[in-house]
Regions:
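Bacterial N-terminal signal peptides that target proteins for export
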Residues: 1-9
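Bacterial N-terminal signal peptides
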Residues: 8-16
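Short gly/ser/thr-rich secondary-structure transition/capping motifs
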Residues: 9, 71-75
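Short, structurally constrained coil/turn elements
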Residues: 15, 55-57, 120, 154
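Serine-esterase "nucleophile elbow" of acetyl-processing enzymes
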Residues: 20-67, 77-86
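Flexible, glycine-rich phosphate/dinucleotide-binding loops
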Residues: 34, 70, 135
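Acidic/histidine-rich helix-loop elements
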Residues: 37, 62-70, 99-103, 179
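Alpha-helical cap/lid subdomain in secreted, periplasmic
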Residues: 75-207
């Protein structure tokens, strides 16, 4: 009888732990995710976490993004980032600075692929946040760059946001004075895009 009660209590405790667990999401990108030019309370990580928590989700968003980071920079620091315990999802959003600097899409793809492989080796799910190149480096470059993210998503069966700045890029009302980095309203739009995908992924995870 005592043993039976003990087992029941143990099961209840485990259920309570699971029910109260906080999902941990790491944003791993560049200035577009880091919150460049904005006060801390307006950073994407804060806005996204507040929006999800306001809807009742137990979630922690960690800002693992670095302004100015290229895919090579991300590759150099991914091992350190993955030391964070109990990561439930890593959102990979690098490549914009590669594109702005005209770095070969072949190199960018190779770096992102290594980041994906290293993250996968830790059994951490990945959400890939893509970028699109303008035509300033030529149509051939744009075509090659734009194929990076769909190709990686297909190869590694990753959920994909085709364009992180969907509805924000090239719209002055959603960007800071430089015309590149989202302002608060733009950050809210990016956050809503990520929020929808995060909710979908965690619902699938719990089924």
């Amino acid at each position: 009888m005592i043993k039976k009660v003990f087992i029941q209590i143990t099961i209840l405790c485990l259920l309570c732990i699971k029910a109260s667990a906080v999902e941990k999401v790491v944003l791993f990108g560049d200035s577009l995710m880091a919150g460049y030019g904005l006060p801390a309370e307006q950073h994407l990580s804060v806005v996204l976490q507040n929006q999800l928590q306001a809807k009742g989700y137990k979630i922690q968003i960690i800002n693992g993004s670095v302004s100015g980071s290229t895919s090579a920079g991300g590759l150099n620091r991914i091992e350190w980032t993955l030391q964070e315990p109990n990561i439930d999802l890593l959102i990979l959003g690098l490549g914009a600075n590669d594109m702005l600097r005209g770095i070969s899409p072949v190199e960018t793809k190779a770096n992102l692929e290594k980041i994906i492989q290293m993250t996968r080796s830790k059994n951490i799910p990945i959400l890939l946040a893509g970028m699109l190149a303008p035509t300033s480096h030529g149509l051939a470059y744009k075509k090659q760059f734009d194929q990076i993210y769909p190709s990686l998503a297909a190869t590694y069966n990753l959920p994909l946001i085709p364009f992180l700045l969907e509805g924000v890029a090239m719209r002055p009302e959603f960007n800071q004075g430089d015309g590149i980095h989202p302002n608060l309203e733009g950050t809210k739009k990016v956050s809503a895009l990520l929020e929808k995908k995060i909710i979908e992924l965690f619902k699938l995870k719990t089924k």
